[in-house]
Each structure stands twice: as structure tokens, then as C-alpha cells.
Amino acid sequence: MELQFLGTGAGQPAKHRNVSSLVLKLLDEINEVWMFDCGEGTQRQILETTIKPRKIKKIFITHLHGDHIFGLPGFLSSRAFQASEEQTDLEIYGPVGIKSYVTNSIRISGSKLPYQIHYHEFDDTSMGKILETDKFTVYAERLAHTIFCMGYRVVQKDLEGTLDAEALRAAGVPFGPLFGKVKNGQDIELEDGTKIFAKDFISEPRKGKIITIIGDTRKTSASVRLAKDADVLVHESTYGKGDERMARNHGHSTNMQAAQIARDAGAKRLLLNHVSARFLGRDCRQMEKDAATIFENVKVVRDLEEVII
């Protein structure tokens, strides 16, 4: 499981940062990639990666400001040009209005999509659990931006314990149907009367990962709830230390506020993105140092950076 950041800037493209987009790579888990936001130039950024557009099966939009959605029509159209590859349907999750934006853009531009898009729109009355699959559950809450904006909490369901095949063979169990029974948690008895207890050969279930992705927002308790015990919290940091009033006036957060959210939520790791273009390399290192006085495991991410979860 990996995160890759396609755009980490705020507001408009800059030389060193594109606007908002990131992907959650779930190739080993479900052979899919999930995208979060799709700002202008996202498809160009994808060309610098190993991501295959047809693997992107779900897109989650945090809000309808242009730096988070202006790349969506272009990406959807380019995804359709992959005639040599299997066309797969796509699901888009986001605030009310995202369907109208996409369908009108496709219609007005005369674009044709050879795959279906299934829309899931949300408002204040439909927050909470928004998606559940065999392996993942996704929750959403409203944040505190200048327009309706959502944060997402992706919860991987607990993983089954693994079978210690070598120990089972050493205990005299032949590979075959009996192996399968033990793997499924059944106790068995061998021909010589030896009893094999499945619990002795299967490890304890492993806790699934939690990934929280916070859209544009002022500091809010909703962010703490979404980030509770998260393995990774991705939080916007449009502003730096001392800019709290400006951040509040514009519906954004500082690095220090993001660190407070991570600390209060008990998150394990904080990744700061949506960084203003005025913050360059040295400034970003200072942002990390300042935030680390509140929450130690913090990093300002860069475009195209990959993070293993």
C-alpha cells in the first residue's frame, strides 16, 4: 500500500509544485488505484509515474474549487483513449455538483467516454460511511472551508492471520485438503491420532491500516475524528507558523495546526501538503521543524513523492 503525491501545491500551479492530487495505490490489496482530487495538470503528472489510468477505479473529490477539479475532465477523456487496454468503469465520490461539472464538461467538449461513470454525491445529510467493500471502508465528514469540503478516512479491514506452512509440514500434515482445513481454522486429526489445532499454526489477525486525507480546512474537530489512530494523516498546510489569522480568514490551516490535529488524534505519521508556492525548500524544512515541536513524525511532501504505508 502506497501514497503517491501528484500535486502538493495550493491554489495554482507553481514551478516546483502542481495543484492538488494524490493516489492511494492498492495494487497488492485489490489491484486498484484510488485518486483523491484531480487538479489541473494531473494527467501530465501521471506520465511521470508508473500509474496506469485504467487502474484508477475510484476518484474522491474533497471540494469543488478549481485547483482540486480542473484536471478531471481531461483525465477522464485521456483515460478513454487507451483503446488497446480494457475499458473499466469508474466511480466518482464528492460533493453535490461534481456530477453536473463532469457531465457538462464532457458534453460541451463533445467528448465520448467508452466506460460508465457512477456518481456518489454528498451533502451535510449524507456524511458518515460512504463506501464499504470486502476489504475497505471509507468514511467522510464535512470540514471547515469556505465552501462545502470533505475529509476522507480509509479503513482497511483487519487482515486474517497467516498460516505457518513450514511448522504444519513439520507436524506431519501433508500438503493438500488437510492444509486447507487448518488454513480455514478447522482442527484436524491425523491418521496416527495426532490432533492438530488450527490456532497453533495461524498467526493473530493483523490490524488493517487507516489513511486519513483532509481537504482544505480551518482547524476543526472533524479532522481529529477522521484522523483517530490513523497510520498516515495527510493534512493541508497552506500557511506556516504565525499565520493562524490569515489561515482562518481563508479557510485553511497552518503546519502547527495540522500537527495539533495529528497529536490530538493519536495519528502515527503526518504528511503536509497543499503548500503555498511562497514556501521553497528551506522554508519547508523550517515548517517541518516547527511542526515537529508538536508532533515529531512529520514531513512536507513533494510532487511525485511515494510513501509506503
Swiss-Prot record:
Catalytic activity line of the entry: Endonucleolytic cleavage of RNA, removing extra 3' nucleotides from tRNA precursor, generating 3' termini of tRNAs. A 3'-hydroxy group is left at the tRNA terminus and a 5'-phosphoryl group is left at the trailer molecule
SUPFAM superfamilies: Metallo-hydrolase/oxidoreductase (SSF56281)
Top-tier EC class: hydrolase
Disulfide bonds: none
Binding site for Zn(2+) 1: H63, H65, H145, D216
Positions that bind Zn(2+) 2: D67, H68, D216, H274
Single GO MF annotation: zinc ion binding
Pfam families named in the record: Lactamase_B (PF00753), Lactamase_B_2 (PF12706)
Record keywords: Endonuclease, Hydrolase, Metal-binding, Nuclease, tRNA processing, Zinc
Cofactor requirement: Zn(2+)
Note on how the cofactor is bound: Binds 2 Zn(2+) ions.
SUBUNIT field: Homodimer.
Family in the record: Belongs to the RNase Z family.
PANTHER family: ZINC PHOSPHODIESTERASE ELAC PROTEIN 1
HAMAP family documented for this protein: RNase_Z_BN
Matches recorded under NCBIfam families: PRK00055.1-3 (NF000801), RNase_Z (TIGR02651)
Protein name: Ribonuclease Z
Gene assigned in the entry: rnz
